């Protein structure tokens, strides 16, 4: 399955929730979901009853688009979450929060996860002083994440830092905005992650 490259705001309208896919437009209240809070298409405003399977599938899609992962990656993360002790759904969210592209976003170095993924793949990010260009790389507690020296004046990065003054920085990371360096202090608790999803439905989907 190829990565989705179409209009991301259509996804939010179809799923009916904000998935933080558009940074500035979302903050300004100008996103397509704000203007048209119903599904796209001729029959978008009709209310239709969704089956149990449909609800489970929708929750899975929310998580996939929220973190920008493909089906193969998602299944890999789910299997790992299921192997771990504790609540599988919570484990899944915690694992996805450790993805390098997500941590870059949480630190305020990118206004969207899509841009954060580009920063990683294009070699702009260092982890503990070494370049890592794999978005799915799992960050560990204490890891030092920084923008490489040549990229620190990137206009989009600077703009993202300005926007982070409105959105705030995740409490589980520590960031020096002047040096463009952050430390992943701890894995967040599920209640700290404001993702509009019922992950238990995803667990039910894969338990069939």
From Swiss-Prot:
Entry keyword set: Ribonucleoprotein, Ribosomal protein, RNA-binding, rRNA-binding
InterPro entries: Ribosomal_uS4, Ribosomal_uS4_bac-type, Ribosomal_uS4_CS, Ribosomal_uS4_N, S4_RNA-bd, S4_RNA-bd_sf
GO CC, one annotated term: small ribosomal subunit
Gene: rpsD
Domain of life, per lineage: Bacteria
GO molecular function, one term: rRNA binding
Domain S4 RNA-binding: 98-160
Disulfide-bond pairs as recorded: none
Family assignment from sequence similarity: Belongs to the universal ribosomal protein uS4 family.
Keyword rRNA-binding included in the entry's annotation: yes
Family matches, as CDD domains: S4 (cd00165)
Complex formation: Part of the 30S ribosomal subunit. Contacts protein S5. The interaction surface between S4 and S5 is involved in control of translational fidelity.
Annotated function: One of the primary rRNA binding proteins, it binds directly to 16S rRNA where it nucleates assembly of the body of the 30S subunit.
SMART domains: Ribosomal_S4, S4
Protein's UniProt name: Small ribosomal subunit protein uS4
Gene Ontology BP terms: ribosomal small subunit biogenesis; translation
